[in-house]
Swiss-Prot record:
Homodimer. This is Orotate phosphoribosyltransferase. One of its GO terms (biological process) is pyrimidine ribonucleoside biosynthetic process. 5-phospho-alpha-D-ribose 1-diphosphate binds at residues 26, 72-73, 99-100, 103, 105, 124-132. The gene is pyrE. The keyword Transferase applies. Keywords: Glycosyltransferase, Magnesium, Pyrimidine biosynthesis, Transferase.
Length: 213
């Protein structure tokens, strides 16, 4: 685990974005941990979040021309990541996002920001069922752009309805790489360093045994 990944876990724990306990997911599964990126909700939170996304992007080595944030959660993420890339990595790249409803006056259309073209890096909080990615792909393809990759905050590394994860489905269906700031594996490595969290470690490992990929 890299220093920025450890720092991200501590940041998420400090903001209660990442919690341990017993949580019922939309899928009906009982999970020993829960991640709610919506709780990164202040100016300082967003500034820090952008730095972690930018760090993971640079670390991945993937090449891209533009950041795309799907509405709604992806919008602030794309914005803060673009700022962090410019301020901390000297990479001044365009970004854009979509509107849920197309506008019929003014600039019109369903995109805001830069023109959607070239190699697109899609940024979002998490991938649960991959629905947002599929909707975004329609927009990207309609504009003649290509998907360079997807960046999310956490990869839960768990099976979807079949034998593979929603993330593996996205990688297979769109022939792209999905990268994340942290994975379930990183989370377990972090818990292993913390004796006081042994109870959570056991629960997370048991969950991975049952649902992991």
């Amino acid at each position: 685990m890299k220093p920025y990944q450890r720092q991200f876990i501590e940041f998420a724990l400090g903001k209660q974005v990442l919690k341990f306990g017993e949580f019922t997911l939309k899928s009906g599964r009982k999970s020993p941990y829960f991640f709610n990126a919506g709780l990164f909700n202040t100016g300082r939170d967003l500034a820090l979040l952008g730095r972690f996304y930018a760090e993971a992007l640079v670390d991945s080595g993937l090449e891209f021309d533009l950041l795309f944030g799907p509405a709604y959660k992806g919008i602030p993420i794309a914005t803060t990541t673009a700022v962090a890339l410019a301020e901390h990595h000297d990479l001044d790249l365009p970004y854009c996002f979509n509107r849920k409803e197309a506008k019929d006056h003014g600039e019109g259309g369903n995109l805001v920001g830069s023109a959607l073209q070239g190699r697109v890096m899609l940024v979002d909080d998490v991938i649960t069922a991959g629905t947002a990615i599929r909707e975004s792909m329609e927009i990207i393809q309609a504009n003649g752009a290509t998907l360079a990759g997807v960046l999310i905050s956490l990869d839960r590394q768990e099976r979807g309805r079949g034998e593979i994860s929603a993330i593996q489905e996205v990688e297979r269906d769109y022939n792209c790489k999905v990268i994340s700031i942290i994975t379930l594996k990183d989370l377990i490595a972090y818990l292993e360093e913390k004796p006081e969290m042994a109870e959570h470690l056991a629960a997370v490992k048991a969950y991975r045994e049952e649902f992991g990929v």
